[in-house]
């Protein structure tokens, strides 16, 4: 191989590289999609959790929806009010006060409170157990196998003594727990105060049927509704009008709590200093981490 041949080869490759680069550059200009700079600015203000709590797949899609589709700027529960204000500033819109949304577990029955429980030997998940009859007497209450806990990316929900329990110090209100609950006992509710009242039951059967399957379930007696305008009995179950719920309602709410025979009206949310002081010496129940085992795992194979 002579230097002439080497030079021709190198020149040919260089020429091809220049041509291909030119083609790629032309194609890049031809097929370029202009991105609104506001989309990038909104993405920078979002927390990047990609939790889906806003109703979109991720932060990028939500940012595009805000800029291009005029979606609400207050949908990011992880970012909270400060994020909403920043996004509103980019979009040149005003935003009113943003209430934090948090989950409420509408069940208060721990293991010993549930009647009619039977041994379950299937897949240790709520979705699977919900397909099986006679897992427990109550067909409305928490199954306690932890689908909600596993769905939470912020470690804000654990199963304690068979009952899904929210850590409101960690919770950001993304709603992942509510989406995976097969019994729909978790609702995402606006918290007008750090602590709100909740009905910790979902059973819509008549009172005598409730007492047959649960020691603590709401029997729909109506005492709360007769005590406070915030309550209403619907389908044998006490409900709360959260639109009318404010801090000023506390006296009548406390009166209703005293009237509740089954003590199903409970306050949920961040603990107060008084609560922490009262419970500092109490021993906490064990946190249950369900094992993913079925009867097949314990089967002894022979042959």
What spans do the regions from the language model cover?
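Short recognition patches in nucleic-acid-associated and regulatory proteins
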Residues: 228-245
């Amino acid at each position: 191989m002579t230097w002439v041949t080497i030079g021709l080869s190198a020149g040919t490759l260089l020429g091809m590289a220049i041509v291909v680069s030119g083609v790629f550059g032309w194609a890049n200009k031809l097929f370029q999609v202009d991105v609104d700079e506001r989309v990038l600015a909104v993405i920078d203000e979002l927390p990047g959790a990609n939790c889906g709590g806003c109703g979109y797949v991720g932060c990028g899609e939500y940012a595009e929806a805000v800029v291009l589709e005029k979606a609400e700027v207050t949908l990011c529960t992880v970012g909270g009010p400060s994020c909403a204000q920043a996004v509103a500033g980019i979009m040149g819109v005003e935003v009113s006060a943003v209430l934090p949304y948090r989950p409420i577990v509408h069940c208060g029955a721990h293991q010993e409170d549930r009647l009619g429980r039977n041994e379950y030997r299937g897949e240790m998940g709520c979705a699977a157990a919900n397909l099986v009859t006679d897992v427990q007497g109550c067909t409305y209450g928490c199954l306690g196998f932890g689908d909600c806990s596993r769905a939470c990316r912020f470690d804000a929900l654990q199963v304690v003594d068979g009952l899904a329990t929210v850590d409101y110090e960690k919770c950001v209100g993304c709603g992942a727990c509510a989406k995976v609950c097969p019994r729909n006992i978790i609702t995402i509710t606006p918290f007008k105060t750090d602590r709100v009242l909740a009905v910790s039951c979902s059973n819509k059967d008549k009172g005598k049927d409730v007492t047959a399957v649960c020691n603590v379930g709401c029997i729909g007696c109506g005492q709360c509704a007769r005590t406070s305008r915030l309550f209403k009995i619907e389908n044998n179950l006490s409900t709360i009008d959260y639109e009318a719920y404010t801090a000023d309602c506390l006296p009548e709410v406390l009166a209703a709590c005293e009237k509740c025979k089954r003590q199903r009206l409970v306050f949920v949310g961040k603990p107060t200093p008084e609560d922490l002081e009262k419970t500092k010496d109490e021993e906490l129940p064990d946190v249950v981490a369900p094992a993913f085992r079925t009867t097949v795992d314990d089967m002894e194979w022979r042959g």
